[in-house]
């Protein structure tokens, strides 16, 4: 079985061999190559110690000396070169207390998480596959190297990674590996929010985001997002729905493109339904104010998972607006665009369509036509260059100061009033008209 290694990777491997050491491409790059995918990174494992690697290559960076890792720079690209090693006892369900370097490749491969990630390759020895990773690739199976219980006890994040790899590759998780995750799921609480966030985004933006269901069934969401468990357990007795809140959410994830903001929004768009649920006399469920309450919950959840402010703010706005159904007039759409922001606004249509496609067939055609009309008016507003943000106004603070307005709250208040009038009537967005309106406002404030 042959893998065409990049020229620089071959150069590093050959150079190490010329100096008396072994070296192989290893891990995810081998897996992806065998699957016909283009690896994002190329990692190299070697019998050389980090000091020897540094002595051999002219340009290196110390990126993980304590773990035997040196980055070799070739043509402004970095390649991580790591000494064969054996991991010692794990003290925090994430990192080993110490590592021991070895000259035995098999011992290095034994410490790795899954069989599909425990293969090595160079053009001299070919594929080194001690744990039948190639068999599991062909069978589309995620299986731990050795005993799953041991691998997950060493590093609790591996449990999440098992589901994430399954989602990215379209694989199944082997039975014993699944059983070990169910047993050890509470240990995920020892892993930092930042690391969980990375895995969550990779899963959500994969081809199989509905594998959030597996995280739930294996007990992992109970650790980092218990709100999702409640969603899965909340029915929707309502003519607009045919799934529980959680199952509806999983269906909507499949109806938006693999964008982080969109997938996070769909994951959380109905997060408040379980706390907003009411039942009428006919046994129908209602979820009044769930978008507003859900936006606040979304912000708290994303902050808890250490998402950046921009991501959090975008999801907050989209969750808050996802169920808003104003009468479609240019005035209403302009105000919605102003409220949400012109950059984010197009995503709202994707959110609304996905939400609709995850519901029952009741009035589905009408709902989709409403969204289409909403989008048509939005595009007309763009084509007409109508003002939907303060920065697009033909008057600004400097203009008002020249008209004698002192800098301060009064100036901001005048701009706000002018903007409100422009949102109602975009024909007013001309410099002379706005100055005349400003003079009237100034006079009224004297």
Language-model features: where?
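Catalytic cores of the polymerase beta-like nucleotidyltransferase superfamily
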Residues: 1-446
């Amino acid at each position: 079985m042959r893998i065409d290694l990049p020229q620089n990777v071959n150069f590093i491997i050959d150079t190490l061999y010329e100096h008396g050491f072994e070296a192989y491409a290893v891990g995810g790059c081998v897996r992806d190559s065998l699957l016909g995918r283009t690896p994002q990174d190329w990692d190299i494992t070697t019998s050389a110690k980090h000091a020897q690697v540094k002595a051999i290559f002219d340009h290196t960076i110390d990126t993980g000396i304590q773990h035997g890792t040196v980055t070799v720079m070739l043509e402004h690209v970095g390649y991580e070169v790591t000494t064969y090693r054996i991991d010692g006892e794990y003290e925090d369900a994430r990192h080993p207390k110490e590592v021991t370097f070895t000259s035995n490749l098999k011992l290095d491969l034994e410490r790795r998480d899954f069989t599909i990630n425990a293969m090595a390759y160079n053009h001299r020895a070919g594929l080194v596959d001690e744990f039948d990773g190639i068999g599991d690739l062909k069978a589309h199976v995620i299986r731990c190297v050795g005993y799953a219980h041991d691998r997950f006890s060493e590093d609790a994040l591996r449990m999440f990674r098992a589901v994430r790899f399954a989602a990215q590759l379209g694989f199944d998780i082997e039975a014993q590996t699944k059983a070990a995750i169910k047993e050890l799921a509470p240990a995920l609480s020892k892993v930092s929010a930042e690391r969980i966030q990375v895995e969550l985004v990779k899963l959500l933006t994969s081809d199989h985001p509905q594998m959030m269901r597996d995280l739930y069934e294996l007990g992992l969401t109970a650790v980092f997002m218990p709100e999702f468990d409640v969603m899965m357990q909340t029915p929707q007795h309502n003519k607009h729905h045919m799934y529980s809140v959680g199952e509806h959410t999983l269906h909507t994830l499949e109806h938006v493109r693999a964008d982080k903001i969109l997938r996070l929004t769909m994951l959380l768009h109905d997060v408040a339904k379980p706390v907003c649920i009411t039942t009428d006399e006919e046994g129908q469920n209602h979820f009044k104010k769930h978008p507003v309450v859900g936006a606040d919950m979304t912000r708290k959840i994303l902050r808890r998972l250490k998402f950046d402010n921009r991501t959090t703010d975008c999801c907050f706005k989209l969750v808050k607006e996802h169920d808003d159904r104003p009468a479609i007039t240019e005035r209403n759409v302009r105000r919605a665009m102003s409220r949400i922001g012109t950059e984010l606004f197009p995503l709202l249509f994707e959110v609304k369509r996905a939400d609709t496609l995850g519901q029952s067939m009741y009035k589905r055609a009408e709902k989709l036509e409403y969204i289409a009309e909403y989008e048509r008016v939005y595009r007309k507003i763009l084509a007409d260059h109508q003002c939907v943000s303060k920065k697009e106004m033909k008057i600004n603070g400097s203009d008002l100061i020249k008209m004698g307005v002192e800098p301060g709250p009064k100036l901001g208040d005048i701009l706000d009033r002018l903007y409100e009038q422009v949102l109602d009537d975009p024909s007013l967005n001309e410099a002379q008209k706005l100055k005349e309106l400003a003079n009237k406002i100034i006079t009224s404030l004297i």
